[in-house]
Amino acid sequence: VTGGEAGTGQLDPAPEEPADTIIGNTRELLGHGLTELRRVVLDVVTAGLRAADPGLAVDRLVEFDGGLLRAGGRDFDLDQVRSVVLLGAGKASLAIATALERKLGDRIDGGLIVTHQPVKHELRRVEVVTADHPVPSVASLEAARRLATLAERLGPGDLLITAFTGGSSALACLPPDGVPFAAKQRLHALLLESGASVAEINSVRKHVSAIKGGRLAARAAGAVILNLTVSDVVGDAVDLLCDLTVQDTSSTSAAIATLRRYGLWSEVSPEIRSHLDSEQSESPALAGRDITTVVLIAGAGVVSRMEDCVRALGWRPVVLGSQIEGEAAGLGGFLGTLAAESSARGRPFTPGTVLLAAGGEATVTVRRQAGAAIGHGGPNQEMALAFARAAARSAATVAGAFVDSDGSDGGTDAAGGCVDSTTAPRAEQLAVCLDDAIAEHDSGSALSQLGDQIRTGPTGTNISDVWAIAIAAGDTP
């Protein structure tokens, strides 16, 4: 696939067979609409997902030779430690643990990994259990208790290696004393619907937890800690990435401010309000602890690989950024308008351009009548519909793919959506109302009817969102 002769954005015929991809329904997505452009954006987001493979990152950034474990510019002499224990939870944790066990073998003395994905094979040295996401379940509570118990057994002379990644807050959830688990579950659900960013949500979760905010590290008193993680937050702040085992930089006052900002202070339970008003909600000090954190994958690195893919396809990459945040419908509408204007009028971007972003975060603020049902969808799917709606308003030839890198957008079984400038007219023919779907946060249902949901299944990684937008020459009115 190329961007056409001399990179003009004129389209070449589509190959008969879809490119090799981790997207499971590529044929469906290429069965309608602007097939050539769709193939380009699907190839590019696939390149981004491949670049976000945590196992490959461990192979590249963690070395083990002659008893020395090297990571993050540090040497850890495993011959001098009493035990090596691996603890983790999150969407990318199993992939990290698998690669690490392959590297260290029986030098790992035990551990526990909590995941939400089906376990295809057991690890030899580390137990793997499943729990629930995005709202914690009783399995999440039990997993968190076990992580806490294992950490408490460690002390001076032990090496604790962690693999906490995005999703750990729900998969391993242990409320502080005095806060019922049901109240913590409701807190998670309220925050997910609020439109708050990951950073804001975590500022609350960390102060209503018995293990987050560095509390798990405090339980492993005296142990040396090596954190291996991937970034799913804007700015790659380590106390948001693996906040169980690093020093927390947020405050209880920030948590309370977040709840008030989104109108949730009066919605959370009295026990949570009482806890946040107490000194127990402040995170422990970890000064003097030997803690090393290695960010294996971040959005900027993924974007670089996507750029390489775009060039290989004969198009011109333009990086929008790795720290884009905003409401999904607003972002999608803006990008759809921008792409359509560029296609039809050659400004601000010329045809033959692919716009890229990875590591940012689209959010959805759920607005509904009391008691009304929530639609089926997620931020990337809502963004895709808003893009399609905006792109249809001018004589444009554009396509976009919007994917949550973990394979589950908004907790659904779809990773995102792939649309183009013919999507909105086709939706009208099929009696699918894009305006209603966006207003009712029912983007998943609409995209499913259109055959435009992207399905990957659990990817084993989590670097937030990956977006690609291809701009070809349109018909200037």
Give the predicted meaning of each segment.
Residues 376-477:
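Internal helix-turn-beta structural module
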Residues 179-197, 248-263, 369-400:
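Gly/Ser/Thr-rich active-site loops/lids in small-molecule metabolic enzymes
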Residues 87-89, 112-115, 161-166, 226-233, ...:
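Short beta-strand segments
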Residues 4-85, 94-103, 137-156, 296-353, ...:
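N-terminal glycine-/serine-/threonine-rich phosphate-binding loop
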Residues 88-119:
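Active-site cofactor/substrate anionic-group-binding motifs, chiefly glycine-
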Residues 114-156, 205:
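Glycine-rich oxoanion-binding loops at beta->alpha junctions
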